[in-house]
């Protein structure tokens, strides 16, 4: 395909509003353009990459018996009222009315639609299982769209739904999807982890997230590609090397979530769901009597601990939440942080939010900084982290402004429900006892759920089982963020390309190093001088030969300076560059492997054979 015929509006500079490198490069390299806040047009290069990813998905889903279909994006609100999500989904839901004043939504997800279709068509267990999916645009009214394609108001998603007559059958399909997702993301060239995830608004019971890991850009060997003009990093002057490190560090590490993973086992979880190895300890110290002490101007745990000369681990942090309009007291060891997802899941609450100062004062009789679990009203619900029960003679708020209580002992002075509600910390033991926890940032690219009967119960999707009984259909849900795959791949495969000019100056610029499976084209064929007829003829022959061998070829036939052509080539990021230059009359061309910066001159007649060898090596 001729580059002059494509819409590839590259920019000379990085866009000033981009915070993450994937957003900056997608815009600068001419892959996408923003139409309005959170809404993007996918230009030809991006569309080709997305279509290649769709092909990978379709091939892997065919192996597990998943069947593609297409549901409408414009949905009647009545379906969402059936499931209860019309009122509870929140402000992200696009709501609109037609000319008859009927309520509609733009679908952010399609559980209700697929459930209705199957409910109306399937009456017996003999018609199950069904495994359906679609690839379609979704809509969420994000309050603050950001980071390019990672947080948008319109996005492309693959959502699949499976329907079963029992949980054992669901387990089989769930495992099929887990393996299919691993195959898809591996083929796409992603460094990813399958982690324990939270079902969130989807209502799932068991779930697994697939996170593209976005590591810090500190490893020069990974993030920097040297031109053939530079033998090694050791040849780069120290001051230039420092500039390169600063450029790498200047771009924010993307990733909406933190992953906690074991250094020695397969354990990995979203920080919201991560836990650690817990060993209850026996109390050895004698229990002191309660004593009220004045703690003037002490509002925080560290201030109280310093004032009373105790360690923060000997204090109790007391928080008040409102869960489905009911007050819940949450307790933590003083130096720990609350994990609201764990608390919300334990309470099985639809809504959970921190109480206001006024609500806290009405419940405890004191303001923030002086709250505690002792002498609360009869029937108060207290949920404490499991570490709290190990405390002896702890310090807690006295429910009296400016005062705390010492000698607080769980069990004697208050009763609580003990459960893991804390946020884990790096360096703690993995819950499986193997290795310690480390953190990494990640971009969620896929999520699978065991929905169970969440939607079939609320929407009356039932079948007759083998015994003639009416039972709810058991469901699974499987999503992949198709458009955000482009961001995830670029985040992992962006590179800083460094070269040395004939004058001895060092130059560096960002570009993309696309994995072969997702690159919009396989080969970038560049004619240095389009006015040289010999070079033009050789380019045309090479283009035909490459295409005949199955290569997707982007031919740069533009009448531009060679420097601009090479700069655009680095930005666009195709795996192989073939340059027809000054030696065209001799039948000599240059091959450059984008991933390594290595280049070699070959006879044009040997180009295909050489490429086959080089692509196997890389």
Curated annotation (Swiss-Prot):
Protein name (Swiss-Prot/TrEMBL): Proline--tRNA ligase
Location in the cell: Cytoplasm
Family that this chain belongs to: Belongs to the class-II aminoacyl-tRNA synthetase family. ProS type 1 subfamily.
Molecular functions (GO terms): aminoacyl-tRNA deacylase activity; ATP binding; catalytic activity, acting on a protein; proline-tRNA ligase activity; transferase activity
Role according to the record: Catalyzes the attachment of proline to tRNA(Pro) in a two-step reaction: proline is first activated by ATP to form Pro-AMP and then transferred to the acceptor end of tRNA(Pro). As ProRS can inadvertently accommodate and process non-cognate amino acids such as alanine and cysteine, to avoid such errors it has two additional distinct editing activities against alanine. One activity is designated as 'pretransfer' editing and involves the tRNA(Pro)-independent hydrolysis of activated Ala-AMP.
Protein keywords: Aminoacyl-tRNA synthetase, ATP-binding, Cytoplasm, Ligase, Nucleotide-binding, Protein biosynthesis
Sequence intervals crossing the membrane: none
Key word Signal present: no
Entry EC number(s): 6.1.1.15
GO cellular component terms, A-Z: cytosol
Catalytic activity: tRNA(Pro) + L-proline + ATP = L-prolyl-tRNA(Pro) + AMP + diphosphate
GO annotation, biological process: prolyl-tRNA aminoacylation
Enzyme class (EC, first level): ligase
Subunit structure: Homodimer.
Domain-level remarks: Consists of three domains: the N-terminal catalytic domain, the editing domain and the C-terminal anticodon-binding domain.
InterPro entries the record matches: aa-tRNA-synt_IIb (IPR002314), aa-tRNA-synth_II (IPR006195), aa-tRNA-synth_II/BPL/LPL (IPR045864), Anticodon-bd (IPR004154), Anticodon-bd_dom_sf (IPR036621), Pro-tRNA-ligase_IIa (IPR002316), Pro-tRNA-synth_IIa_bac-type (IPR004500), Pro-tRNA-Synthase_IIa_type1 (IPR023717)
